Curated annotation (Swiss-Prot):
Keyword field contains Cytoplasm: yes
Compartments (UniProt record): Cytoplasm
Keyword Cytoplasm: yes
Keywords: Cytoplasm, Stress response
InterPro entries xref list: Hemimethylated_DNA-bd_dom, Hemimethylated_DNA-bd_sf, HspQ
Organism: Escherichia fergusonii (strain ATCC 35469 / DSM 13698 / CCUG 18766 / IAM 14443 / JCM 21226 / LMG 7866 / NBRC 102419 / NCTC 12128 / CDC 0568-73)
Disulphide-bonded residues: none
Known function: Involved in the degradation of certain denaturated proteins, including DnaA, during heat shock stress.
Family classification: Belongs to the HspQ family.
Name of the protein in its database record: Heat shock protein HspQ
Cellular-component GO terms for this entry: cytoplasm
Gene giving rise to this polypeptide: hspQ
Record-linked SUPFAM superfamilies: YccV-like
Length: 105
C-alpha cells in the first residue's frame, strides 16, 4: 500500500518555484502515458511514488492544472494567503465537499 503525504484539498507549495497550490486529486503512482526521456527526466523510483494533480495560479492569476511528484511539493503552513485568495477559497470548498458530500439518487 502506498501512503500519500498530502491530501485532497490541502494547500501545498512547489518546492523549487515556491508557487502555492491546492491538491485536487492523487495518483498512487505516475499514471500519465509513459513519458519519453525528452519529456520527463524522472527515474523509476520517483514514478512509483504518489503524484498529485495540483491547481496553481500562473503569473497572471489564472488557474493552471499541474501534475507533480510528491518530492516536488512541500506542506503549506499558513491557512490564509491575501495575495492569492482564490487558492484559499478553492481549498475551503474542496474540504467542505469532502466533509459533507451531496447524495445523488
Amino acid at each position: 500500500m502506498i501512503a500519500s503525504k498530502f491530501g485532497i484539498g490541502q494547500q501545498v507549495r512547489h518546492s523549487l518555484l515556491g508557487y502555492l497550490g491546492v491538491v485536487v486529486d492523487i495518483d498512487p503512482v505516475y499514471s500519465l502515458a509513459e513519458p519519453s526521456p525528452d519529456e520527463l527526466a524522472v527515474n523509476d523510483e520517483l514514478r512509483a511514488a504518489p503524484w498529485y494533480h495540483v491547481v496553481m495560479e500562473d503569473d497572471n492569476g489564472l488557474p493552471i492544472h499541474t501534475y507533480l511528484a510528491e518530492a516536488q511539493l512541500s506542506s503549506e503552513m499558513r491557512e490564509e494567503h491575501p495575495e492569492q485568495p482564490s487558492m484559499d477559497e478553492l481549498a475551503r470548498t474542496i474540504r467542505k465537499q469532502l466533509q459533507a458530500p451531496r447524495l445523488r439518487n
